[in-house]
Curated annotation (Swiss-Prot):
Annotated positions binding Ca(2+) 2: 188, 190, 192, 199
Gene Ontology MF, one: calcium ion binding
Organism per entry: Crotalus adamanteus
Keywords attached to this entry: Calcium, Metal-binding, Repeat, Secreted, Signal
Entry-linked SUPFAM superfamilies: EF-hand
Primary location group: secreted
Protein name, entry field: Reticulocalbin-2
Length: 306
């Protein structure tokens, strides 16, 4: 089961429900953008001089060739770095919660206690009569299978690297086949090894009284046909499924870099100077380039000696 923090981040990166992959997400309030109420309060207490000082250090770290400008490639690379840093930090925080005995490993029992306050064990081949209980049993078994797959060395415990793969399988190459299979089990209703457009849309059926599909269906169909179905055969193969269930962080980062250039490049040279960024400080802070402002509170990003 993916952690809420990861789900939130992925929704931000993907633009949220009902948003096209190529469409930039709408504005979010300061609390969401800066990572929480504590971060908002801390940032509001900084003087304008301190805000700009921290921001300038981050700008200098993005500027790999030290020419005083940020290119699309430099912005994209930094955003990917920002994303990975967030994932590692999130996994570390989660790991501390799950590792109840502090031995540096997480057992299946510890995972259950943290998630459900008790150890749960369902029979894999038993179907429960109660629909809600059966739905929960299925989710629990999916968690168990993911835990077992992440347990690369088979010792029944997850070390930190394995736990990170369990929490964020999209970041672990050895989890790809499992994620594809998991997706097929969920969406491939006819068992043909592919996901059709109807299976992709799930249980949606147009209201007989409606003259046209709702906007979100139009958007999802467009994503299916133009972003995921590369060979245009009307269905998603296991390889094509990866672009849906395991989005390419490189592509997402490039989209954000292009967006920043489109919005902030005042002289049209397709690169950003420090002055252009400082003149659009709020936009830059509210982007993946600063992890929605979190980097201004993380010394590993803005401390000049690092």
């Amino acid at each position: 089961m993916e952690s809420p923090t990861l789900l939130g981040l992925l929704l931000l990166l993907l633009g949220g429900p009902g948003t096209s992959l190529g469409e930039h997400r709408p504005d979010y309030d300061k609390e969401a953008l800066l990572g929480g109420q504590d971060e908002v309060e801390e940032f509001s207490k900084l003087s304008p001089e301190e805000q700009q000082k921290r921001l300038k250090v981050i700008i200098s770290r993005i500027d790999v060739d030290l020419d005083g400008f940020l290119t699309e490639a430099e912005l994209s690379s930094w955003i990917q770095h920002s994303f990975k840093s967030y994932i590692i930090e999130d996994a570390k925080q989660q790991f501390q919660h799950y590792d109840k005995d502090g031995d540096g490993r997480v057992s299946w029992e510890e995972y259950n206690i943290q998630m459900y306050d008790r150890v749960i064990d369902f029979e894999e081949d038993t179907t429960l009569d109660d629909a809600e209980e059966e739905s929960f049993r299925q989710l629990h078994l999916k968690d168990k299978k993911r835990f077992q797959k992440a347990n690369k060395d088979g010792d029944s415990h997850l070390d930190f690297e394995e736990f990170a793969a369990f929490e964020h399988p999209e970041e672990a190459d050895y989890m790809k086949e499992f994620v594809i299979q998991e997706s097929l089990e969920e969406h491939d209703k006819d068992g043909d090894g592919f996901v059709s457009l109807q299976e992709f849309l799930g249980d949606y059926r147009r209201d007989p009284a409606a003259k046209e599909d709702p906007e979100w269906i139009v958007v999802e169909e467009d994503r299916f046909k133009n972003d995921y179905d590369k060979d245009k055969d009307g269905k998603l193969s296991p390889k094509e499924l990866l672009t849906w269930v395991m989005p390419n962080n490189e592509g997402l980062a490039q989209e954000e870099a292009v967006h920043l250039l489109d919005e902030m490049d005042l002289d049209g040279d397709r690169r950003l100077s420090a002055n252009e960024i400082l003149e659009n400080q709020d936009l830059f802070l509210n982007s993946e380039a600063t992890d929605y402002g979190r980097q201004l509170h993380d010394k590993s990003f803005y401390h000049e000696e690092l």
